[in-house]
């Protein structure tokens, strides 16, 4: 495998992956507030920003407070994604001071699609299927809820909104063992960039270690290559990161979601 310039990968990520892709999901709106993009209408508000927000001190505090107060008025939570190399470096402390709570950091990994693409190898009795119908999306949400022990019912509406806006912008896969979903995952294509985001990879505990997550990576990488995309992006959990590294992905930074939840 050829040496990879991780600095160049990071530069591509910063240039191309800071903002959401292509078509806006049904029911969602994008609003600009100075340097940041406010994503409104999903199950939770989201803030996306360039590497350098471009404001500091009291001005930054006011920017943060406006986002919190905007979503508080809607009775909704909001998340702000911060990468380890972002500026200003005190943004996390200022988010916490405004009432945001950090989640566990994820490792941002990039892979070269052509190197990762392969024929997916599945255990006996497991079938890989592409889905887009509402009933299948509800099953995916139930599967995610079961695995993570959290209410993931919003996943069905989120996926349906993306499919309804532009079905070519997302590929949703399920690995089925009989009438059970053993693993679920999807790809979000970023038109006009080199990137496909690999999302949602979730496997039932008793199916882990049997190659389903690897098969999902391989299948999605193959389609990325077929569609002309060069790079794969994952915000990886501690469980997923080692698998992705073995598949040739490269760490470029970490990302942390800072969550604000309205008082009850």
Give each language-model segment a name.
Residues 95, 244, 249:
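Conserved active-site tyrosine of GNAT-family acetyltransferases
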Residues 152-206:
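A conserved beta-strand-loop-helix scaffold within acyl/acetyltransferase catalytic domains
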Residues 1-19, 52, 57, 106-109, ...:
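Short amphipathic alpha-helix that is part of the acyltransferase structural core
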């Amino acid at each position: 495998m050829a040496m990879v310039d991780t600095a160049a990968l990071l530069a591509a990520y910063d240039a191309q992956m800071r903002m959401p892709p292509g078509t806006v999901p049904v029911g969602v709106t994008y609003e600009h507030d100075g340097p940041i993009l406010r994503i409104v209408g999903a199950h939770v508000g989201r803030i996306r920003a360039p590497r350098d927000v471009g404001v500091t001190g009291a001005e930054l505090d006011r920017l943060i407070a406006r986002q919190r107060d905007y979503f508080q008025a809607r009775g909704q939570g909001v998340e702000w994604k911060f990468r380890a190399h972002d500026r200003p470096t005190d943004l996390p402390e200022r988010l916490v001071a405004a009432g945001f709570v950090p989640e566990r950091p994820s490792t941002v990994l990039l892979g070269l699609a052509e190197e990762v693409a392969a024929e997916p190898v599945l255990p006996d009795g497991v079938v890989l299927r592409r889905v887009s119908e509402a009933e299948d999306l509800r099953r995916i949400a139930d599967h995610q809820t079961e695995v993570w022990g959290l209410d993931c019912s919003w996943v069905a509406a989120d996926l349906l909104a993306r499919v309804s806006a532009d079905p070519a912008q997302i590929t949703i896969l399920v690995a089925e063992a009989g009438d059970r979903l053993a693993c679920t995952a999807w790809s979000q294509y970023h038109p006009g960039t080199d990137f496909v985001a690999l999302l949602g990879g979730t496997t039932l505990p008793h199916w882990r270690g049997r190659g389903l997550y690897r098969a999902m990576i391989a299948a999605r990488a193959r389609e990325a290559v077929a569609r002309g995309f060069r790079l794969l992006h994952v915000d990886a959990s501690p469980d997923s990161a080692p698998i992705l590294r073995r598949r040739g992905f490269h760490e470029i930074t970490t990302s942390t979601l800072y969550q604000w939840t309205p008082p009850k």
